[in-house]
Amino acid sequence: NTGFAEQNYIIPDASSCSEVLYTLLDEAKISREAAECLYTGIVHDTGVFKYNSTTRKTMEIAGALMEKGVNAAKIIDDSFYRKTYAQNQILGKALLGSTRILDGRCIFSVVSQKEMEFYGVDTNDLDGIIDQLRITEGVECAIFFYEKAFNEYKVSLRSNDYVDVSKVAA
């Protein structure tokens, strides 16, 4: 953040905007509803606490929010793991249709508009497919394409430890 506003409150190593907001609030006055919103923001921005941006402070704040009555398991399940039957079908199609290349270090999959129509899903239902591809054992780089319009594709790139996909995406 370049500090472009008149007033700036920047915590460079904060995991999320929600973590920054928490530090600005009077902890005693945070309601359960507000705590749920802050917790949801932290969970999303940290990838359920697995991204490098997650710190001890992040975990302490999450714990304090849980003490306000946040149902952490429900928020995480509803946000990341609960899928409709159609979402599971398109995920299965994407995984079954995936191809490993470069001695198995890279995996890619493509979902067409025709397949999306067949399963009755839209682009929001494709969330999580790239992450499932990425966590395949032996894979360093995952690529997921889905067709937005005839011959127009959205491409998602994810990597694990050794490949900087931001250099390709830039």
Give residue ranges: language-model regions.
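Hydrophobic helix-and-loop "lid/oligomerization" segment in the mid-to-C-terminal part
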Residues: G47-A170
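Acidic-glycine-rich active-site phosphate/pyrophosphate-binding loop
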Residues: N1-T2, A169
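Short alpha-helices
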Residues: T2-I61
